[in-house]
Amino acid sequence: MFGLRRNAVIGLNLYCGGASLGAGGGSPAGARLVAEEAKARREGGGEAALLPGARVVARPPPVGAEDPDVTASAERRLHKSPGLLAVPPEEMAASAAAAIVSPEEELDGCEPEAIGKRPAVLPLLERVSEAAKSSGADGSLPSTPPPPEEEEDDLYRQSLEIISRYLREQATGSKDSKPLGEAGAAGRRALETLRRVGDGVQRNHETAFQGMLRKLDIKNEGDVKSFSRVMVHVFKDGVTNWGRIVTLISFGAFVAKHLKSVNQESFIEPLAETITDVLVRTKRDWLVKQRGWDGFVEFFHVQDLEGGIRNVLLAFAGVAGVGAGLAYLIR
């Protein structure tokens, strides 16, 4: 009985790793067991055999230590290893960003954009032609702009001078008496016609022009150049005529007045260049076929009724002998 109780005490002490529970204390049971195992090793010259009645019991971890997860796989235990901590979130985000913006083999030569940026509001300019969906025999679009050496031709220079002069006159509210240079006599007639027809278009469509101006929201030169999108949209259906052209130039003059009112006169010339670029470089074939500005004058030619009436009255005054008084009143 005593032997059984003694073995139980030794077993309990060995399990708990503490001192002997017997009265008087004595040496720890664990120490005695280690000594006996060492003695058996020395006598046997090999591994110590387990003592009779001794049981192999796993020693629990120290108080406060985390129990090992024996069910965890090798991969899970690896991730929990203190020496292999997870990458901080900010470093992981930076790595992901670098991977996104620099896959040169997938971008096919395109330059990556910085993350978080949107492409500047982008110039969505389309080149419109009378055959927008058909290509030429050489594979190029009929509306392909001319090479740089052909851009500054007579039609372009004449058009730019007429349109620029009209926009400046509308902005200042006064006619420029200086003769046209490149445009010559034909340009002078075209400018006079544009003044007459364009002024009428602005009067008749002022409300619509105001709405279009608000949508453009012009604040800088880049916004001025976006005017080309309005022109492209107008010609998107492939229909070109002088009515549309004069309406667009008239709206350009309306915009020029606005630029003058907000002290942005320096944008008027870029506006005139934008209008000329779209008209001449995308509608060149049509303009040449219509004989350019001579055709414009002929299309909007209106018989000078006031001049005709004046001539009739003067002739009547001379025949009837009414005298110089009537001639003065009707001249």
From Swiss-Prot:
Pfam families (alphabetical): Bcl-2 (PF00452)
Q: What is this protein called?
A: Induced myeloid leukemia cell differentiation protein Mcl-1 homolog
Q: Post-translational modification, briefly?
A: Cleaved by CASP3 during apoptosis, yielding a pro-apoptotic C-terminal fragment.
> What organism is the protein native to?
Mus musculus (Mouse)
Record GO terms (molecular function): BH3 domain binding; protein heterodimerization activity
Its membrane topology: Single-pass membrane protein
List membrane-spanning regions. Answer: 308-330
Q: Which family does it belong to?
A: Belongs to the Bcl-2 family.
Q: Which UniProt keywords apply?
A: Apoptosis, Cytoplasm, Developmental protein, Differentiation, Isopeptide bond, Membrane, Mitochondrion, Nucleus, Phosphoprotein, Transmembrane, Transmembrane helix, Ubl conjugation
Motif BH1 located where?
234-253
Q: Where in the cell is it found?
A: Membrane; Cytoplasm; Mitochondrion; Nucleus, Nucleoplasm
Q: What does this protein's UniProt record list under function? A: Involved in the regulation of apoptosis versus cell survival, and in the maintenance of viability but not of proliferation. Mediates its effects by interactions with a number of other regulators of apoptosis. Isoform 2 has antiapoptotic activity.
Modification sites for Phosphoserine:
102, 140, 143
The entry describes its oligomerization and partners as: Interacts with HIF3A isoform 2 (via C-terminus domain). Interacts with BAD, BOK, BIK, BAX, BAK1, and TPT1. Interacts with BBC3, BMF and PMAIP1. Interacts with BOP. Interacts with BCL2L11; this interaction may sequester BCL2L11 and prevent its pro-apoptotic activity. Interacts with GIMAP5 and HSPA8/HSC70; the interaction between HSPA8 and MCL1 is impaired in the absence of GIMAP5.
Residues annotated as coiled-coil are none
